[in-house]
Amino acid sequence: MVKFPFPLLLAIAFIKIGALASASVELHVSPSGKTGATGSATDPLPSIKDAANSIKSLSPDQKAQGVTVLLAGGFHFLPEGVVIDSSCSGTSNVPLVITAEQGASPVLTGGHPVSGDQLETVKDASLLERLDTNARGKVRQIDLSKLGITGITPFPQVFSGDWRPLQVVLGTNSLPISRWPNGEYGFTTMKSVTDNGSATNGGTFVYRDDRPVRWQKALADNELWLRGFWRVPWVINGAQVKSIDTNAGTITFFKDVGGGIGSKYKKDAQGRRSGDGTEAWCAVNLPEEIDEPGEWAVDFKRKLLLIWPPEGVSAQNPILVAANKDPLLALDNASYVAVKGLRILGSLGDALQIRSGENNLVAGCDISNVAQTGVSVRGGKNHRIVSNDIRETGGSGIAAAGGVKATLEPAGHEILNNDVSRSANDFPEPAIQIGIGGASQILGSAVGIHVSHNRVHDTANAGIRFGGCDHLFEFNEVYRIGLNSGDLGGFYGYCGFTGFGNVMRNNFVHHSMNGNAFYMDDGTSGALVTGNVAYKCAMGVLMGGGHYNRFEYNIMIDCPKGIHLDDRGISRKYTLEDKRLGGDVQSVSPDQSPWKEKHPELAALVAGGETTIPKGDTVIGNVLINCGTSIELPKPEYAAGIEQKGNITTGSPADFVDADNFDFTVKPGSTLVAAIEGFPPIPFQQIGLQVDEYRKSIPQRDMKLLREGDTTKRKFSSTTDIEASNKK
């Protein structure tokens, strides 16, 4: 696939979307609109749904002239979400455009607005007794039934991704569900494990603090749940507490948490996991733990939202309480639809979802405060997600899939110039997810997706995670990832043996000491990682047992390990008989067209038969500066299939234009690159966000946070994981 520079791609996008000037039909929508309105500027429709119905009634000739839906300022409440289907599609010359009226700031939200008069005093004596003494008189209650929220149910005995009962928002901030310990990364740890749990038993652990003594009333009401990293530091699950023994200092669950409790890295002689004292957990949704303004909890029995209102609540700035899990705006098999310049927030589902269709555009939007994904693209062709700000999501900021791997038909999607931050707040998913799927959704196959010029930062999990093949990742900046998880990467590939054609070039990954900059995990093969800069990451490159991966002409600075390639495929039996790896290979027929022509290495790998030992990998021309271990390869007998040459460990900050301020442009005439034959220039100034039609300026990075912030809150050792797994 031919790839074009970023400005040209945007120009193509703008041509496809077209200009508003030619649109002959304008439909105005206002929160104050009336049912039966005409949709004129003076008689606006009450909702986008009404606008969609009006579009369906237009004649083909009217649609052919183009349609624009213009939203007035204010909160557009979408309690059930809105679906734009194929009957509303535009064309390549005149798309359907959904945008704001000139000068207006509309907000699409699934949140019921709640202001002062709906915040009632807590009168139930048993509830008041449960509140912290400092919170009594400050906590208010909201009767959910008065908001029309009637289907809310308690958490199950074990839960993972889709767990949040409500999304509660004020302004641009998601208000936190009550927890102990406080803080978005507030956790305590287990002291030890007395029972790992089984199919018939939930497991028991010893707690450290006497805080659980306060939770006896919640326990008596069967409304006590904990969330924790019970077994490994990259999977968080919730579990309902069955009992607390305050004499023994133990907590017992109703039901077994997947894999049991207790770190998998510490086993006794009998194979029982006694725990290593680092397993992190917290209590959630307890009235007893509402002790700060903004915190809230749901009383499932009484159908009440208990909240300590923060300052600033008013009719103009209400608390938004969202309970609907449908996407706020869904393009369902629609094509040539442009959603531009809108603010979308407050949902238990996705903010915006594209299902099938072709050539849709989401551009210049401000998307936040949703419990699932900001923008989800599920199939279709040539969709573009351009220059959006996406933050405060429970799962991924952007997720996309499409294309057909067996035929190498590309999706053609483009994810360009987006600022994605503070994702994975509720469950461990990457900021940008290409294919694979996860806790929030199953995305499916992904082929031929272009991810460029994005800024990904301050996220609990991975930066960009991908499956599939033939993707291009270039000019992205990724930093401060893995703030609440482990075993992840700035770029994390989970593609198996069929991951050929994935290119990562000219990216900058930095300040992520709990993540590896480029991580090709569990047999991922066929990737090209070239011309990238990794600074202050756990590892610059980590390859786990893959083949035909090329790590060439990268710069690694201040990483404890520069480049690590291992042979885990031997101990983990990465053979063609493996259901995951072998089944994936069979699904693409590597000895037939188009695979045999485009990616002949896969057919060669299969023909050779031996797939447990690394084959065809290269480590060439890399610069490693101040890395504790520069290059780490398997034992010589297993490293014969890895080509290593021309790598250097010399160099200093003086070789770069402004290393102190993280500008790693190599100075002209530097001896650093001259020492490596064929080292291509890295266009460092082109990395990251760019000014375009939708993004008028580039937000500054928080330099103080970069210099002083902690990125090891959930410290994870890839080396420990490799060693432990290889002993199986």
List each language-model region with its residue ranges.
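Bacterial N-terminal signal peptides
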Residues: 7-18
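Boundary at the C-terminal end of the N-terminal hydrophobic targeting segment
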Residues: 21-24
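Extracellular polysaccharide-degrading/modifying enzymes targeting complex plant/algal/animal polysaccharides
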Residues: 28-355, 361, 376, 581-595, ...
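Surface-exposed extracellular loop regions of Gram-negative outer-membrane beta-barrel proteins
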Residues: 360-366, 523-527
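Beta-strand repeat scaffolds of extracellular/surface proteins
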Residues: 32, 72-74, 87, 100-103, ...
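Positively charged n-region of N-terminal signal peptides that target proteins for export
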Residues: 1-7
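Glycine- and acidic/polar-rich repeat regions and solenoidal domains
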Residues: 81, 349-353, 371-378, 391-663, ...
